[in-house]
Amino acid sequence: MSRTTRQTRTSLPRVVARKPRRGDVHPLTPAAIRQILAALPVEQLHGLRRIELRARVDDVGDPFALYRREEQDILLYSLPPDEWWMSSLDRACARELRRAGARIVRHRHGVSIHFAGGGMDLFMRDVLAHEIGHHVRNQVARYPRTARTADEEAVADLHARRTRVRLRDDA
């Protein structure tokens, strides 16, 4: 008989917090991310190595987050704390922002997004769930990917909706 003890609970992916861009914040803390991950089925996290909070490099939402298939990690980018300016905003993103409580104001040269209370946290929880959806899709796929980008995004959105319901039920 082996003297090693098997771990019955699968460990969560590592959460790494880097400094946000100057003037930005990370809406989700590492502790909040761990709490979200702990509420998800272990199968969804299988193979996910790391979630990293990172400074955004470019404009807000370009992108909000990124799943890197080869590295099996998720990058969540920093955001301005009060008001975001974006040159454009597609309908799906606007719908998700409004659902999280954002007020969207259209201007001549772009769009401003304003959050009150914990709305930005709710939005980033959905973004994280969407990226986990990409991870789940890539874990299940046995053959080379042939799906179009629109199909990949639809699967990730479906996963985000299911995760949102699961997290709401656990709260």
PLM features: what roles do these ranges have?
Residues 42-45, 141-142, 165:
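Residue-level recognition of short, structured coil/turn motifs
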